[in-house]
């Protein structure tokens, strides 16, 4: 895989994941208590021995850069690296990235310097485990110019994805980006051609692009150079290439979830607790997911009732009840709290006992969840200060609300407490 260069698309402003992207780039959003979204594609690359990795981003990239620098230091791999490329304005390109393809085009001069045969284009906000070496191998065996990784999908979700039709040889003959109505119906196919049984084919009659591509180096360079007005892979480059290039589909059979929205992100995190077997597991020795080694102490649990939950390292929780929740690193939960169906991202630092007591004496709130608080169906971002006897349960069943001045948003009925928020004692949300 030394002849493959990976390019991870960090996405735009991350509006669908806001407010989690208020102070960080989308790939830097915490995941499963101790990871970040970017760890998924980078780990998949490392496991496939693809060690030349660029990450393209244009918003709030400082924390992403810091995480990647501290985590992925390929000392000893003479040409291995993970590097962030932020959008920059030049005389040739005075504007920011206009889309996924434009982002790659603007750094084409840099990618072109590498002696590689293929570019592996990845997304930074998906949860899945894939053997990219198998993906690239299939691309080479079929003699494709471009190979798309695809999944069969049901009608309910089909209009949110790029859909395609393929022939008996797996070649893509038609492609439509997020079709609606009659155009959607025309993209319906017999997915048994992918190896699904009749029942599965009936349930999932569409073939969806995962937004993961392998391009031959020359094919991508030509497409970007000859179509300067085309700025997006899914909307323009791929549909336009179907006629003149050999486009192949690669069926991915594992778990895959686009977690680019608050609701999908919340559901994917809590699904990690599902019994008896979650759809995605971080407990896989053959294909581990890597992240930064933080050297934190073990979690301390004092007289708690914890069920179906994931607790990261370095937490301190006492005399509380936790059910179907994910607790991030350095989470602190005081006595008589109830946390249910929630994602707590934890903290970036510890406060000493003296500091915490001093804050309480001044009527201020330490980092963590204060005594007697109840949190249900919520996401609490890092370093939040939740006071005592606070209730966060979306009491009025509001679907959408922007209350940034009060320290929270509501998205799809999920309360999202923003990073560094302060929620006063006795607050009811």
From Swiss-Prot:
It holds the Pfam family NTP_transferase. CDD domains: ADP_Glucose_PP, LbH_G1P_AT_C. It is an enzyme of class 2 (transferase). Pathway: Glycan biosynthesis; glycogen biosynthesis. Signal peptide: none annotated. GO terms for biological process: glycogen biosynthetic process. Keywords: ATP-binding, Carbohydrate metabolism, Glycogen biosynthesis, Glycogen metabolism, Nucleotide-binding, Nucleotidyltransferase, Transferase. GO terms for cellular component: carboxysome. GO terms for molecular function: ATP binding; glucose-1-phosphate adenylyltransferase activity; structural constituent of carboxysome shell. Alpha-D-glucose 1-phosphate binds at residues 162, 177-178, 209. The keyword Metal-binding does not apply. Transmembrane segments: none annotated. Its EC number is 2.7.7.27. Homotetramer. HAMAP family: GlgC (MF_00624). Involved in the biosynthesis of ADP-glucose, a building block required for the elongation reactions to produce glycogen. Catalyzes the reaction between ATP and alpha-D-glucose 1-phosphate (G1P) to produce pyrophosphate and ADP-Glc. This is Glucose-1-phosphate adenylyltransferase. It comes from Crocosphaera subtropica (strain ATCC 51142 / BH68) (Cyanothece sp. (strain ATCC 51142)).
